[in-house]
Amino acid sequence: MNIQALLSEKVSQAMIAAGAPADCEPQVRQSAKVQFGDYQANGMMAVAKKLGMAPRQLAEQVLTHLDLSGIASKVEIAGPGFINIFLEPAFLAEQVQQALASDRLGVSQPTRQTIVVDYSAPNVAKEMHVGHLRSTIIGDAAVRTLEFLGHHVIRANHVGDWGTQFGMLIAWLEKQQQENAGDMALADLEGFYRDAKKHYDEDEAFAERARNYVVKLQSGDTYFREMWRKLVDITMTQNQITYDRLNVTLTRDDVMGESLYNPMLPGIVADLKAKGLAVESEGATVVFLDEFKNKEGDPMGVIIQKKDGGYLYTTTDIACAKYRYETLHADRVLYYIDSRQHQHLMQAWTIVRKAGYVPDSVPLEHHMFGMMLGKDGKPFKTRAGGTVKLADLLDEALERARRLVAEKNPDMSADELEKLANAVGIGAVKYADLSKNRTTDYIFDWDNMLAFEGNTAPYMQYAYTRVLSVFRKADIDEQALASAPVIISEDREAQLAARLLQFEETLTVVAREGTPHVMCAYLYDVAGLFSGFYEHCPILSAENDAVRNSRLKLAQLTAKTLKLGLDTLGIETVERM
């Protein structure tokens, strides 16, 4: 149940009845403070201005038409014309019952869409590094949320599997007589890449051979395609280990690398020329865009084919968007790519729209993100100043979590300890990232992310086990509990219930904006409200069975909400800490 949507509909109807236009926005929001009720309708200001009347006067007229019987216990006008809505305890109790009766906690499913989500995108012949973390885990949280809401999600791992470097790599592979690249560890392959590059820079004959190999690879020569495939396979096999460690849902089947779009590129260049969008300029094929200006204030030229006939990333991105609409039948396409690529994407998509490859009705959304920084505020590096490998980061997370967990659980079996350390360590790295607004840079800090206080994975995982501990202590008759009514009589019960019932609203925001930090903030809030409820509203020592069972049901919905919410983030819960 989406209470915000229900109230929006009711307030909108009342506004129209009071003389507002049919497209009026009620602007129903969750209230920031308890004294303002559970929800506020803030839309009177804008509409009253259009109608030439005072907002408070409009609010008074709206109230005469607003029927919230059975939903709100009190509705009042505040300030210049805000409408504060206080939910009826009986309504909250009924909604809690309905949520508990559903595996989905009463979350409805919107109209099903086909949504393509582009995320992770590592490069072939290179090991994943910390720069891939944000795209991979933020994108995966979006995918999990969209799938939970019932959408058909197509994961698109836009792997860097094409380019001139492959001639160099194949030539070096051949020179070293290492055609069995599929048996090499990726760490070796990365060293192999460095050696190949060094040789390419220093040996002109080798470089010439590498350039010839690129031509042969691009012309589809069987031998060179086979060598290229080996390099791709070993890379993706190793990357899959990282995805599995991160509890990310990407698989080999989701790879849609740059090479996929190669056959489309000549046709796209020819079509853009035929449509008068692309022209020859200094030997290259260029699209001049009025929407983007160069330093002189003239339309910016975007090259789609170099004078030597080679294509650019922009050409591939145009083909990519076209493919996702025409072949994958996307209703919406989300790109989890860092903010530095924004202008590049906007230029490609402007060309896509002008060419008519993707209609305006299909959103192409750049869900950009900032950088991961060290404590010094600079890009996160090793002590030696090198790039941090993602596998090394996860190893350290596991080691730190192992020490932390062993300290708190000296009697835990080695097997159990390892499972718990994995959930806490990997969860801590992911949650530290997901809990920050993706558009900003954030400081990577081991001490903060592994703390048991504050908005961290260990705190959230502990909060979940704390709720479960109530049920371990209680001698519960499952059947009696299922049929027991929910009674909301205390303020803290009402506050917890109202927040729990905002789960669907939170999911809706995350799905619309691609902002998992909103889910993190919501779950942290729920954990805090449960803590206050637990301290002030005795559960197991309640005054009678009816109150005890009702409070157990609130605890039950809290546990289910925390577990399901953390699952949409890809954070593992544990039964004991």
Swiss-Prot record:
SMART domains: Arg_tRNA_synt_N, DALR_1. PANTHER family: ARGININE--TRNA LIGASE, CYTOPLASMIC (PTHR11956:SF5), ARGINYL-TRNA SYNTHETASE (PTHR11956). GO terms for biological process: arginyl-tRNA aminoacylation. It is an enzyme of class 6 (ligase). It holds the Pfam family Arg_tRNA_synt_N. The keyword Metal-binding does not apply. NCBIfam families: argS (TIGR00456). HAMAP family: Arg_tRNA_synth (MF_00123). Monomer. Keywords: Aminoacyl-tRNA synthetase, ATP-binding, Cytoplasm, Ligase, Nucleotide-binding, Protein biosynthesis. InterPro entries: aa-tRNA-synth_I_CS, Arg-tRNA-ligase, Arg-tRNA-synth_N, Arg-tRNA-synth_N_sf, ArgRS_core, DALR_anticod-bd, Rossmann-like_a/b/a_fold, tRNAsynth_Ia_anticodon-bd. Its EC number is 6.1.1.19. PROSITE patterns: AA_TRNA_LIGASE_I. It comes from the Bacteria. GO terms for molecular function: arginine-tRNA ligase activity; ATP binding. A motif ('HIGH' region) lies at residues 122-132. Belongs to the class-I aminoacyl-tRNA synthetase family. GO terms for cellular component: cytoplasm. It catalyses: tRNA(Arg) + L-arginine + ATP = L-arginyl-tRNA(Arg) + AMP + diphosphate. This is Arginine--tRNA ligase. It is found in: Cytoplasm.
